[in-house]
A protein has these predicted regions:
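Nucleotide-sugar donor-binding/catalytic module of glycosyltransferases
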Residues: 1-217
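Catalytic core of nucleotide-sugar-dependent glycosyltransferases
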Residues: 135, 140, 204-247
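Membrane-interface aromatic/basic loop that binds lipid-linked glycans or pyrophosphate carriers
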Residues: 242-269
Length: 269
């Protein structure tokens, strides 16, 4: 888990972890030098339960480096990523682990990535979309090849479980990796790994003011909103293309071609 000024939600997330039906795990936390009560809350849980490994970073590392540092620091058979503001349903770890172990029996020694859908909620955990995959046009079967995976994200970090063979492939990583979950997914696809999507959503994916900040102000000015939207879309696509380029994706023209093609295929599937 990577944390930063998460006092409002982190207690609820931690509680959901300790209510899991599968309890054989250790929680590693990197805190990005929070200046609220986040660390105090974490230490309270650590005192009660004892299986939390907390490290406080120098500020400003960012999500990519925080999560990758956590992955590198931990030593286990399997690894999951956790956001500070979500809530895990009680069977999340058990269900994901069961799928991982089943796939390992079929393909021993292979890099494996198991991931699930999510239930999108508002800040009070009222479900606004029962399927993140549906609302974000995610088609796991279509996104199983580099051509499409290079233009559209597939696995969300907080739903993922990876095994040790896949962890070994994840390092080293460049700054252009952009997002830890996208980097690991692309590594799995391009290095002979196996993707195991589970459609059953086992997480409440909270959307709140901190991750939609500024949207209402932009809507007050249509032109400003449109310009900001276009700028964001262009900037994000440049980042995604740079990420895909680490895997010899090809030209910018190819990227645009498969970007458009994916949306046409998704609309008619």
């Amino acid at each position: 888990m990577a944390t930063y000024n998460g006092e409002r939600y982190v207690r609820e997330q931690l509680q959901s972890l300790y209510e899991q039906t599968e309890r054989h795990w250790t929680l590693y936390i990197n805190d990005d030098n929070s200046n609220d009560r986040t660390v105090d809350i974490i230490r309270e849980f650590s005192d009660q339960h004892g299986n939390i490994n907390l490290e406080i970073n120098r500020p400003g590392k960012g999500a990519l480096h925080n999560f990758m540092n956590l992955l590198q620091r931990a030593e286990a058979n399997y690894y999951m990523f956790c956001d500070q503001d979500d809530v895990w349903l009680p069977g999340k770890v058990e269900q994901t682990l069961r799928a991982m172990e089943g796939q390992e029996r079929k393909t021993p020694g292979k890099p494996i990535l198991v991931f699930t859908d999510l239930k999108v909620t508002d800040e009070n955990l009222h479900v606004t979309s029962p399927s993140f995959w549906h609302s974000n046009r995610i088609k796991p079967k279509l996104l199983s090849s580099l051509n499409y995976l290079g233009v559209h994200f597939l696995a969300t970090g907080c739903t993922m479980m990876l095994n040790n063979p896949l962890k070994q492939l994840a390092f080293p990583y460049p700054d252009t990796a952009y997002l830890h979950d996208a980097w690991i997914t692309l590594k799995a696809v391009t290095q002979g790994g196996i993707l195991c999507p589970l459609a059953d959503a086992q997480i409440l994916y909270r959307q709140h003011g901190s991750n939609v900040a500024g949207s209402e102000d932009l809507r007050r000015n249509y032109i400003l909103h449109r310009l900001a939207t276009i700028t964001t879309v262009v900037r994000n696509n440049i980042r995604v293309y740079k990420l895909a380029s680490n895997f010899n994706y090809g030209s910018w023209l190819k990227y645009l071609y498969y970007k458009v093609l994916y949306y046409f295929k998704e609309l008619h599937s």
